[in-house]
Amino acid sequence: MAEFQGYLELDRSWKHDLLYPLIFREYIYVFAHDLGLNRSNLLENVGYDNKSSLLIVKRLISRMYQQNHFIISANDSNQNQLFGYNKNLYSQMISEGFAVIVEIPFSLRLVSSLKGTEIVKYYNLRSIHSIFPFLEDKFSQLNYVSDVLIPYPIHLEILVQTLRYWVKDASSLHLLRFFLHDYYNWNTLIIPNKYISIFSKSNPRLFLFLYNSHVCEYESILLFLRNQSSHLRLTSSGGFFERIYFYGKIKHPVEEVFANDSPTSLWFLEDLFMHYVRYQGKSILASKDTPLFMNKWKYYLVLLWQCHFYVWSQPGRMYINQLCKHSFSFLGYLSSMQINLSVVRSQMLENSFLMDNAMKKIDTLVPISLLIGSLDKMKFCNVLGHPVSKSTWADSSDFDIIDRFVCICRNLFHYYSGSSKKKSLYRIKYILRLSCVKTLARKPKSTVRTFLKKLGSNLLEEFFTEEEKVLSLIFPRTYSALRRSYKGRIWDLDIFCINDLVNHK
């Protein structure tokens, strides 16, 4: 079992146990405040930035020192004996500070790796850029795919138990329970989606940390099954079962979950062509084997979610599709398998015969209807795809308006450079171009036709610059040589901004 440690333990042997006293340090709240100011624009900043001050931090720490019991009921009013009249503000500050504290063990782990004091081999981690070579090279060899949505909400206590692998300080875990009490109804087994939405907006940093911890625990078990399934029949399954139910406090015995013939069931998991790919909360399972094998995986996933994470999952919502007949949506692309049939005549001595040759090719398309829906959501067009003016940008200068539209258009072409057919992107370019013109024409309160006639045909020439021409201007020699030697798709891996369709809702 020593060779399985990289998959199962996730290197949880940190000795930085005393995290709870940091909640009484002023600099923690300063860090949290700075991180809130520098937060990515993909996350809505609804924090306390405009109200935070060092005086409020000192007052909060003083009140926490004076308290004998740091417990607040979720049903209390905004006024309580700890926070006084500023419960929402103080609770927000503590939760932001706690989000910084629980990330410290991971930061120390990263710093030690960068300094070379210890070199860690992460078996379960891959970059998002590895997905594109996977689609290009490996996907044509597979036959079946299943879309898997990682289920949530999850039982609150399971979240705390998962963090016990990383955070050894019991006081910090009790503080986490305090915040979960504050945001959710502790008496329910399933967190309502509306509470998840409130919590993710009020404290996105802590929400992402808890969610990523949940996904990491789930994938550590799933990838163990994937990578070591061929060794299960050769080793004792006791450690495997003990790892899945890591506390021994769950009511269901192992024998009830996996029947007595579990080694026979695990025997069918042996498959070297099983692939697992995930981005955010959506993942895919793809295999070269039969649908029976895919149903086996669906069976294990449902048992894992229901008996280990106490999350109800409906097996009927996990569809197993044949790649040559169905397409699936992932990372903003619609991907499917094309089979090109050809007949080859072969002659051997005096005998000649015909052979059917089937060539598989992955087809990645731009979801034009979903892109139009995304543009409609951002008020660039209506539901039918008719361009409208961006009224919120009308107060900006002409240069800023044009630069914003051109940047959006080029980013979309840049992201979908790996698409098999780019004709649908020209409709998106048309929508953005006319939306830009209508936004500019909104300023002098003239019509679009008058505005175009006044400025001439050279208006917005940036929109007509092809993505290939832009790349050839940046890399003149390298790009031209690459195009001559390779006529297929070119995946641009220097993606710094993911479009809205990629983010799983």
Swiss-Prot record:
Q: Does the keyword Plastid apply?
A: yes
* CC terms in the record's Gene Ontology section: chloroplast
Can you tell me where the transmembrane regions are?
Answer: none
UniProt-listed GO biological process terms: mRNA processing; RNA splicing; tRNA processing
For this UniProt entry, the molecular function terms from Gene Ontology, in alphabetical order, are: RNA binding
- InterPro entries for this protein: Domain_X, Maturase_MatK, Maturase_MatK_N
Q: Which UniProt keywords apply?
A: Chloroplast, mRNA processing, Plastid, RNA-binding, tRNA processing
Protein's UniProt keywords contain tRNA processing: yes
Compartments where found = Plastid, Chloroplast
Pfam name, any one: Intron_maturas2
**What residue range is the signal peptide?**
none
Looking up PANTHER family in the UniProt record yields:
MATURASE K
Task: Write out the similarity annotation.
Answer: Belongs to the intron maturase 2 family. MatK subfamily.
Main function: Usually encoded in the trnK tRNA gene intron. Probably assists in splicing its own and other chloroplast group II introns.
Name assigned to this protein: Maturase K
Which species is listed as the source? Morus alba (White mulberry)
